[in-house]
Design a protein with these regions (language model features):
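N-terminal helix-turn-helix DNA-binding core of bacterial DNA-binding proteins
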Residues: 3-42, 68-79, 83
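Beta-hairpin "wing" of winged helix-turn-helix
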Residues: 54-65, 71
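A cross-family signal for key residues in well-ordered alpha-helices
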Residues: 10, 22, 54, 60, ...
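Short, hydrophobic-biased segments on the C-terminal half of alpha helices
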Residues: 50-51
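Amphipathic alpha-helical dimerization/coiled-coil segments
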Residues: 2-4, 25-26, 78-108
Length: 108
């Protein structure tokens, strides 16, 4: 699990890869040519970044005839959210609830 998370963090560390993921979030199922159109990168650079995103399981692919379609896989990002962010969010929500109750009691 840790090795998989390391791959995800490494993949997300690069702004170009985050841009590719954002592009897939806006329009899922793009070809390499479509992904190249929206970015100021060479075809080879986009391919390299997509391969790393695939290794991190952030992008899944499917063949359609001669084309290879790329799809965003949000599961690894959600797993990181649940492990690293979700736990901290729970305390924050509880603190806001306690503050609300204290203010309501003060008004009474």
């Amino acid at each position: 699990m840790v090795a998989d998370e390391d791959k995800v963090f490494k993949a997300l560390a690069d702004p170009s890869r985050r841009q590719l993921l954002d592009g897939l979030r806006r329009k899922n199922g793009q070809t390499l040519s479509e992904l190249c159109e929206g970015h100021d990168m060479t075809r080879q650079a986009v391919t390299k970044h997509l391969n790393l995103l695939e290794e991190a399981n952030l992008v899944a692919t499917a063949k359609r005839g001669r084309e290879k379609l790329h799809f965003l896989n949000p599961v690894p990002i959600n797993e990181i959210y649940m492990r690293w962010i979700g736990k901290f969010e729970q305390g924050r929500v509880q603190a806001l609830h306690n503050l609300k109750q204290a203010l309501q009691e003060k008004d009474q």
